[in-house]
From Swiss-Prot:
PROSITE patterns: ZINC_FINGER_C2H2_1 (PS00028), ZINC_FINGER_C2H2_2 (PS50157)
An annotated Gene Ontology molecular function: DNA-binding transcription factor activity, RNA polymerase II-specific
Composition skew (Basic residues), residue ranges: 363-378
One GO term (biological process): response to starvation
Organism for this UniProt entry: Saccharomyces cerevisiae (strain ATCC 204508 / S288c)
Cellular localization per UniProt: Nucleus
Entry keyword Lipoprotein: no
Predominant location: nucleus
InterPro entries assigned: STE12_transcription_factor, Znf_C2H2_sf, Znf_C2H2_type
UniProt-recorded name of the protein: Zinc finger protein YER130C
Zinc finger (C2H2-type): 389-412, 418-440
Amino acid sequence: MSLYPLQRFESNDTVFSYTLNSKTELFNESRNNDKQHFTLQLIPNANANAKEIDNNNVEIINDLTGNTIVDNCVTTATSSNQLERRLSISDYRTENGNYYEYEFFGRRELNEPLFNNDIVENDDDIDLNNESDVLMVSDDELEVNERFSFLKQQPLDGLNRISSTNNLKNLEIHEFIIDPTENIDDELEDSFTTVPQSKKKVRDYFKLNIFGSSSSSNNNSNSLGCEPIQTENSSSQKMFKNRFFRSRKSTLIKSLPLEQENEVLINSGFDVSSNEESDESDHAIINPLKLVGNNKDISTQSIAKTTNPFKSGSDFKMIEPVSKFSNDSRKDLLAAISEPSSSPSPSAPSPSVQSSSSSHGLVVRKKTGSMQKTRGRKPSLIPDASKQFGCEFCDRRFKRQEHLKRHVRSLHMCEKPFTCHICNKNFSRSDNLNQHVKTHASL
């Protein structure tokens, strides 16, 4: 907005500036002038400052056509009653691209309020010539030594009526909160400790103490400043804690009869919603580990009550196992085993005795199939037609008969007919004896 709203006139006499304060006498004198040269008359505003007029650059261009053009450039000059100002870069309205603000350089008085109580939200209603309509804070006004005194001098009502979003944004940029308290020490301490709510860390909102009691969770929420979130999620936290976590408080499990324990387990498993309303719901929570133990105890007790074969007076009786062979057969088996080992001669027994003992042992072993030895190789699972000789005590099969006899003698009959002549140690196989004799030769 220029102080000289200029207008172009094509004339042979004069090009003049048309203003509201222009005088008709000058116009008449210029019309009556008979000279053939051009003159330019600029009538300054009565309220304009002489220094500001000298500083304004009004460029006059002669286009050599007989017309004098005054360049209508945008010159922003301030009046004498207005402070020096500049365009502000601290805050913008993103929704309005044509919005701009001025920022003043001058210093305010200490008693002058920082903001005007009458906030103007519309840009068209802002008077740039009026200092009270421009809602900006300069960098000089935020000095610590000079500008912290307006917090006490400004009334509380005026601060509460500040509803402009621009003012709140400006305050958040400089990171301080207006505190209208009277105590200076408390104010200085709070100025360094208090932080705006928008600056709070996001992780503080997720610090939900679901493991602690209700009193400790309330104290933690008050210290962290999460009161609204705590009130909204209190019911959900309580439900979550009651369903999935056990309390820290020691719960005493009383010894109850079997029927009452089953009722307690059923009620605690399905009636959780009824206990959510009361404060003593934490005591109703049962340790899951103890529930598993109780289930095992209940199962064992029920089995013992129903089918206990050792309890007197029950309907079921223990069936005694029947021996598959008599005592006489046991004696014969022991005698057959002890005969070859107790023989004093180192040589093998006679064929007649060996055949009789082996045949007798085979007969005995056929009756006692449950006394098999687990030592040795596992039975061959793949059937082989070449292995025609099968063991009668186990599922092993052999290609040669002597291998079958050696297997039965060593594993099933536990016979050791081969004795070392040096240390009198018995062996069931001749190859094992030969290896043993080599150990004596090395000595």
